[in-house]
Structures are given as C-alpha cells and as structure tokens.
C-alpha cells in the first residue's frame, strides 16, 4: 500500500492517486464537543508541504465517496484504503467514546450513504493515544445501533503514538479488538528515525501469536529510506511522493517480492508467502 500523506482537500485525492498512491491518509480535527469538524493538519507539518489545506469533514467524505464508488464520474479504481488520522489529542479522555460515535454517524451518512451504494474503500481509524481506545467501542456500538454492523468488516485500527507494542496489545484487549490491526511507526519527514520498532512490529505480525496484521512506516520521501522499510518487510509506506515509492518498487530487487495492492487484497489478512 502506497499511502499518500496528508490528503485534506478533495482536489488532493486525484493528485496523490495519479502519482501512484492506492491509499490516502487524511487528518480529522474535532470540535470541543467531539464532533469531527475538519480535515485539517495545521502547523507544523512535514517539511516541504502546505499544512493548512482543509475541508469540512462531511464535505470531504462526500468527495471521498465519489472517488471510491464504481460508476461515479470521479471514481478512482486504484484507491482502496483510507487512513483517518484522528487528531483526538485535543479531546479529554472521557470524550473518546463520543468522538467514535459521532465519527461513525458522519461516515454512515456521508461516506457509506446508510449502506446504499456508498464508497467501497477500507477504512483505518488511526488513534494517537492508547487512552482513547473507547473511540473504537463507541464507533462499533453506533454502527450496530444504526443497523449496519456489517460495515465493521470495512474498518480497521491503528494506534499511532509509537507506543510500546505490549501496551498497544493491552489497549486492543480493552477495546475488544481481535483482528483488522494495522501498526504504524514513524516520524515527520523532517527527522530521521531508525527501523528498530518497525522490525519489532513485523516480528509480532509474523509470529504465531501476534496481534498485528499489517505494518506501515511514515513519512518516507527518500529512495534509501523506502528500500530500508521494504527490506524490513513493511506492508505499507506513507509518503508525500507516491511516485518515489512506486519507482523503488519497480527496481529489480523489489519487483519480484512486492506488488501494489488492489481491492481484491484484504488489508486485514496477514500476508503469508
């Protein structure tokens, strides 16, 4: 999965997919009542990027739905996975459940069209704080209450705080999550970061009793870093330059080992070769 980083305006969906992304990451900011409000990152953000592009969250979802619905004039067949980077650190811990409920309602209405031919992409809820695990339970409960528990088949999870992997496992246990787990590791492109924790996450993924299904590394803009991440065995790379990642994947060392994921590839299944 080549994950286009910081896609917060509808026009950027086409821009990053056309450069080779089959996945995008979108920032979600919340108001003080835990309503998802804008797709917005803000300052500071990655080196070499504009940090302030934004849409109202529900408007962005409507654009995203068009981009991921076969038959729509804006349909992008390659776009199969969306990571919502939930900026829930602005909330009190006791608002996490409400944030999850409100997020589920927004997605249900504006993305899934209440189960009536909505967008088809898989969704990862990426949460920055282990204490906010109730965001997951609130989200799940709401889809059930609203009569669409089947949509949880399209939803996965990530805790993005670079926490100790054992602590991440505990948070999932509290949230009742077994499966659909993506594990991120990384840092802004302005700073270097080693691959030690990525390798730990990959080892967990590949062990018989691990809880992780997929591992992604962020934010990677250089060919050398891309090669390091691929050599470590990641499933996804988040980048500001999807074309750079696509280039490296076409190198002889990688093209026989990796291919770009399509809609037929289940993002919740651990890859076994």
Swiss-Prot record:
Its EC number is 4.6.1.-. One of its GO terms (molecular function) is lyase activity. It catalyses: an N-(acyl)-sphingosylphosphocholine = an N-(acyl)-sphingosyl-1,3-cyclic phosphate + choline; an N-(acyl)-sphingosylphosphoethanolamine = an N-(acyl)-sphingosyl-1,3-cyclic phosphate + ethanolamine; a 1-acyl-sn-glycero-3-phosphocholine = a 1-acyl-sn-glycero-2,3-cyclic phosphate + choline; a 1-acyl-sn-glycero-3-phosphoethanolamine = a 1-acyl-sn-glycero-2,3-cyclic phosphate + ethanolamine. InterPro entries: PLC-like_Pdiesterase_TIM-brl. Signal peptide: none annotated. Binds 1 Mg(2+) ion per subunit. It holds the Pfam family GDPD_2. It comes from the Eukaryota. It is an enzyme of class 4 (lyase). Its cofactor is Mg(2+). Mg(2+) binds at residues 25, 27, 85. The active site is at 5, 41 (nucleophile). Gene3D superfamilies: Phosphatidylinositol (PI) phosphodiesterase (3.20.20.190). Keywords: Cytolysis, Dermonecrotic toxin, Disulfide bond, Hemolysis, Lipid degradation, Lipid metabolism, Lyase, Magnesium, Metal-binding, Secreted, Toxin. Disulfide bonds join 45-51, 47-190. One of its GO terms (biological process) is lipid catabolic process. It is found in: Secreted. Expressed by the venom gland. GO terms for cellular component: extracellular region. Belongs to the arthropod phospholipase D family. Class II subfamily. Dermonecrotic toxins cleave the phosphodiester linkage between the phosphate and headgroup of certain phospholipids (sphingolipid and lysolipid substrates), forming an alcohol (often choline) and a cyclic phosphate. This toxin acts on sphingomyelin (SM). It may also act on ceramide phosphoethanolamine (CPE), lysophosphatidylcholine (LPC) and lysophosphatidylethanolamine (LPE), but not on lysophosphatidylserine (LPS), and lysophosphatidylglycerol (LPG). It acts by transphosphatidylation, releasing exclusively cyclic phosphate products as second products. This is Dermonecrotic toxin LdSicTox-alphaIB3av.
